[in-house]
Regions:
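Repeated loop/turn-to-beta-strand initiation elements of outer-membrane beta-barrel proteins
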Residues: 6-9, 19, 61-64, 122-127, ...
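Conserved C-terminal beta-signal and adjacent last beta-strands/turns
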Residues: 421-547
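Surface-exposed extracellular loop regions of Gram-negative outer-membrane beta-barrel proteins
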Residues: 16-28, 34-37, 44-53, 57, ...
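Flexible loop and strand-edge segments within Gram-negative outer membrane beta-barrel domains
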Residues: 17-49, 55-57, 61-127, 133-168, ...
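Signature of Gram-negative outer-membrane beta-barrel scaffolds
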Residues: 188-290
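Outer membrane beta-barrel strand-and-loop segments of large Gram-negative receptors
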Residues: 38, 171-175, 216-222, 334, ...
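Outer-membrane beta-barrel signature, preferentially recognizing the C-terminal barrel domain
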Residues: 222-228, 271, 300-354, 370-384, ...
Length: 547
């Protein structure tokens, strides 16, 4: 960081060279066959992230500048899949399918933000203007090959294929935020325009089960385009009525137009809608120990750009993965009531999630194929209560503990599946300890326990996660040495069951959340140097690319 007179500069560079391992186990009960599929997924990556920022105070009331972000990633992945197929009257598999996929991905992300901050008076009235552009490109290639061995009668078949996808996403956005504090209330208003264009150029070949492989891999070309335009306006106000009562209200309107086009199918799908998103927050302090608060909000959850890509990739001839060009965003209404008494907070809540999308495995009874696809598949209603207790009576120990219990019901849409209605409960505790008087030796212990749960069509089994951290502060606390461990006992496994198209599925997934990290951080230079961190105007769109 550099800060002198009217000019402020900031720069950061981060490089990460690492890897991860995922373990997937699926058990599918077809009417005449039982499938056990295990996938071992390994990925190695080299990531570089750089941020450069500048801001200049042209006058006492006008500051402008820019922020540039560049991310690059070079990832190579290997996925080995083994499926064993059983007849119910026999304990030995009659068919074994072995597949290997080697993937290479080279995503690049570049983003430029131009900002202006104009102060209108000394009371805090100001205008913020953000102009943003980003470009995201990714070349993804996935060749695969394998064998299918049937034991009775003995027969060996082969398969191979490749899938290449060149994706490019461009986004332009402009955002204006106006803050208007007055003696009566604090108001804010603004608007945003966002234009996104995504293009996918796909080449693919899938041999299916054959006796002789084709080494040439003759590929079929396809193109997929997705355009999204969003116009939004909002207004909100905050009013402190007296020492006990405070109110905040807001309203956002969004108009959205999307168009997706598949070249091979010569099919275009247009979607247009306008939605209102109200919010309200009311707070009442009965006395110094008791506070009541009610809030309501409506929000939208959009699919990321990869989930909208209908690109079809094969893991084996019987297992495929694809996105969905007609995937729609879903909407969530949240109602919450809080009561806080000293260090104890009670929350009652109710949520409605409409037209939720998720990845679902669609089994086909005739072929025993499973198609993993993103779909809008259910509505969820949830009612719950949570208790949070904070313990801080000892100067060397601070503890925050939460117990949450809720009941949910689901209704499927365009899917023949058994819904998972029932209770969900989890407990979390986070504890900070000062191990010496100067408070330079710190320790943290956190523990999460997911007892049982239901979500849509999935019944979720229990899991736990334990994390530890030790930090030592030196040289006037400018030097920080941190040793951190997450999921110490490797118990953070996602296990669930579901029934789709009459096929029972039981899954056990581990996403390599166990990690040990040693970090050394040293701050040098003047402690007075400080460059204001700013948010860009396209945070939501950036997140949908994974950046």
């Amino acid at each position: 960081m550099y800060n002198k007179n009217k000019l402020s500069l900031s720069a950061s560079f981060n490089y990460r060279d690492g890897g991860e391992y995922h373990d997937y186990r699926d058990y599918n009960s077809f009417p005449n066959e039982f499938w056990i599929t295990r996938q071992a997924f390994k990925r190695e990556y080299k990531r570089l992230n750089s941020v450069l920022g500048l801001q200049y105070a042209a006058t006492a009331n006008w500051t402008f500048g820019f922020q540039y972000i560049a991310n690059t990633n070079n990832a190579k992945a290997n996925r080995i899949t083994k499926s064993s197929v059983y007849q119910y009257e026999n304990s030995n598999p009659f068919n074994e399918i072995l597949s290997e996929v080697n993937a290479s991905q080279k995503p690049k992300f570049n983003s430029l933000n131009l900002f202006n901050e104009i102060k209108l008076d000394s009371l805090g009235k100001k205008i913020n203007v953000n102009l943003d552009y980003f470009n995201y490109v990714n070349f993804d290639t996935r060749p695969y090959e394998g064998t299918s061995v049937r034991k009775i009668p003995f027969n060996i078949q082969y398969f191979n294929g490749i899938n290449n996808n060149q994706q490019s996403t461009n986004n332009f956005s402009g955002k204006v935020d106006i803050e208007l504090p007055t003696t009566w209330a604090n108001w804010s208003t603004g608007g945003k325009i966002s234009v996104s264009k995504t293009e996918n150029y796909i080449t693919a070949f899938n041999s299916g089960l054959v006796t002789t492989l084709n080494p040439d891999l003759p590929q079929i070309n396809n193109q997929y385009h997705y355009d999204e335009n969003v116009q939004a306006l909002y207004v909100s106000g905050n009013k402190k009525i007296n020492d006990q009562f405070e109110a905040q209200i807001g309203l956002r309107m969004e108009a959205i137009q999307t168009k997706s086009h598949s070249g091979n199918r010569n099919q275009s799908i247009d979607n247009k809608y306008t939605k209102l998103f109200p919010s309200i927050n009311l707070s009442y302090s009965a006395n110094k120990n008791s506070t009541y608060r009610f809030s309501y909000s409506k929000r939208i959850a959009r699919p990321n750009f990869a989930e909208l890509n209908p690109n079809l990739t094969y893991v084996t001839p019987f297992l495929s993965v694809e996105g969905n060009q007609v995937l729609r965003p879903y909407f969530v209404d949240n109602f919450e009531f809080f009561y806080t008494y000293k260090k104890l907070e009670t929350k009652l809540y109710h949520s409605l999630e409409n037209d939720v999308f998720n990845q679902v495995g669609l089994p086909y009874l005739e072929t025993s194929n499973i198609r993993l696809i993103y779909k809008n598949i259910f509505d969820i209603r949830r009612y719950g209560i949570s208790q949070t207790f904070t313990f801080d009576k000892l100067n060397w120990w601070n503890s925050i503990n939460t117990l949450n219990i809720n009941y949910s019901t689901a209704k499927t849409t365009d899917l023949m599946a058994t819904v998972a209605n029932g209770f969900t409960s989890f407990f979390t505790t986070n504890n900070d300890f000062n191990l010496n008087k100067p408070q330079t030796l710190l320790f943290n212990f956190s523990f999460d326990y997911y007892m049982f749960g239901n979500y849509g069509i999935d019944k979720i089994k229990p899991f736990t996660s334990t994390s530890l951290a030790l930090q030592y502060l030196l040289l006037g606390k400018d030097l920080k040495i941190t040793l951190k461990a997450t999921d110490v006992f490797k118990t953070d496994r996602f296990r669930f069951t579901s029934i789709v198209n009459g096929v029972h599925r039981s899954s056990d997934y581990y996403f390599d959340t166990r990690m040990f990290q040693l970090a050394i951080n040293y701050k040098f230079g003047s402690k007075k140097v400080n460059v204001k961190k700013r948010q860009t105007g396209n945070e939501d769109e950036r997140a949908r690319t994974g950046n």
